[in-house]
Amino acid sequence: MKNIFLHSLIVENYRNFKNLELKTDNIPITIIGENGSGKTNILEAISLFYPGRGLRSARLADICRESEDHCSVRALLQSKLGLAEFSTQIKRISNRRTTEYNNSKIANNELSKFTSMVWLTPQMEGIFMSGTSDRRKFFDRIVYNFDPKHAELVSKYEHYMQERNKILAEDMWDNNWLKTIEEKMADTSIYIANNRLKTLEFMQQAIDDLENEFPKAELSIDGMVEQKILNGEEDVVGFIAAELHKTRDKDKLLGRTSFGVHKSDFLVKHKHKNILAKFCSTGEQKAILIAIILAEMNYAIKLTKTAPILLLDEVFVHLDDRRRNYLTEFFISINLQLWVTATDLKGIEEFGNKSQLIKL
């Protein structure tokens, strides 16, 4: 098995940190400190070396330290391709972020070729109650760990969609160019939908196989494209292109694309109770989310033979003793780099004793 882990992390002008350097190894790491000390900021900095906008989905302007116009994060990281240096630079004025791998610029969506990460934050605990977009993005991040090319496909699809919206906003359309863009969207959609369905199958199997103290979840994708593929219908690409053509006038008025895989929803049920997670208590929602994260991590290791970095922000808060004890024992037993934040070690003393301790 190949482990993804940080050897070192250096941040400059990042959030509340002027400068911070951490040396780590392939072991559990516990960050303790008062609220506001910057525990989550460290996890966020690490998460920038994975496709997307980090675990907070923050605006670039919010990441730089107040009064500073730039910030940076550097990491020496054991990647899928071996030991490598990664860096990301953010400039507040230009609102731009650049990422480098061994001093060569790479696109953000290429990071999944090198790294693998799973994270859980308190903000994610409301994902079952939030909008479709948040759940879909959450699930697409899971897909990245099973198929590193998925991030690039999603990025490509979003680019084509923006191009289509720009064309529709014009008074006169170039029908040939619009047709070409819609065909590219349709082709890319099939890959995205198939990746989601394959990952959904992997994840459901992982959840069913994993015996733990958390409720079983039943996963599904609510999307027209995914459903047509599941039904075994022919020429789904042609159907997507035809739908995009049909909705041109409507989408021109709306100023956005109203049909496509960017509208699909990720649905989660409490399997035993047979109710959607959004109708469960907040405690049950957190427990279901933890169950999904554990299953993702376990099956990603099983399927890809790669152990991801696991980032867990305040994961032990509001858990009963039974579940907290299960998690501490589970985390001690697994062989991967795990970052956990807590205000103190109360209730997780054993885990704290067996991890690298960082006090802020």
From Swiss-Prot:
<comment type="similarity">
    <text>Belongs to the RecF family.</text>
</comment>
<keyword id="KW-0067">ATP-binding</keyword>
<keyword id="KW-0227">DNA damage</keyword>
<dbReference type="GO" id="GO:0009432">
    <property type="term" value="P:SOS response"/>
</dbReference>
<keyword id="KW-0963">Cytoplasm</keyword>
<protein>
    <recommendedName>
        <fullName>DNA replication and repair protein RecF</fullName>
    </recommendedName>
</protein>
<keyword id="KW-0234">DNA repair</keyword>
<dbReference type="GO" id="GO:0005524">
    <property type="term" value="F:ATP binding"/>
</dbReference>
<feature type="binding site">
    <location>
        <begin position="33"/>
        <end position="40"/>
    </location>
    <ligand>
        <name>ATP</name>
    </ligand>
</feature>
<dbReference type="GO" id="GO:0006302">
    <property type="term" value="P:double-strand break repair"/>
</dbReference>
<keyword id="KW-0235">DNA replication</keyword>
<dbReference type="InterPro" id="IPR001238">
    <property type="entry name" value="DNA-binding_RecF"/>
</dbReference>
<dbReference type="InterPro" id="IPR027417">
    <property type="entry name" value="P-loop_NTPase"/>
</dbReference>
<dbReference type="InterPro" id="IPR003395">
    <property type="entry name" value="RecF/RecN/SMC_N"/>
</dbReference>
<dbReference type="GO" id="GO:0000731">
    <property type="term" value="P:DNA synthesis involved in DNA repair"/>
</dbReference>
<dbReference type="InterPro" id="IPR018078">
    <property type="entry name" value="DNA-binding_RecF_CS"/>
</dbReference>
<dbReference type="GO" id="GO:0003697">
    <property type="term" value="F:single-stranded DNA binding"/>
</dbReference>
<keyword id="KW-0742">SOS response</keyword>
<keyword id="KW-0238">DNA-binding</keyword>
<dbReference type="GO" id="GO:0005737">
    <property type="term" value="C:cytoplasm"/>
</dbReference>
<comment type="function">
    <text>The RecF protein is involved in DNA metabolism; it is required for DNA replication and normal SOS inducibility. RecF binds preferentially to single-stranded, linear DNA. It also seems to bind ATP.</text>
</comment>
<keyword id="KW-0547">Nucleotide-binding</keyword>
<dbReference type="GO" id="GO:0006260">
    <property type="term" value="P:DNA replication"/>
</dbReference>
<dbReference type="Pfam" id="PF02463">
    <property type="entry name" value="SMC_N"/>
</dbReference>
<dbReference type="InterPro" id="IPR042174">
    <property type="entry name" value="RecF_2"/>
</dbReference>
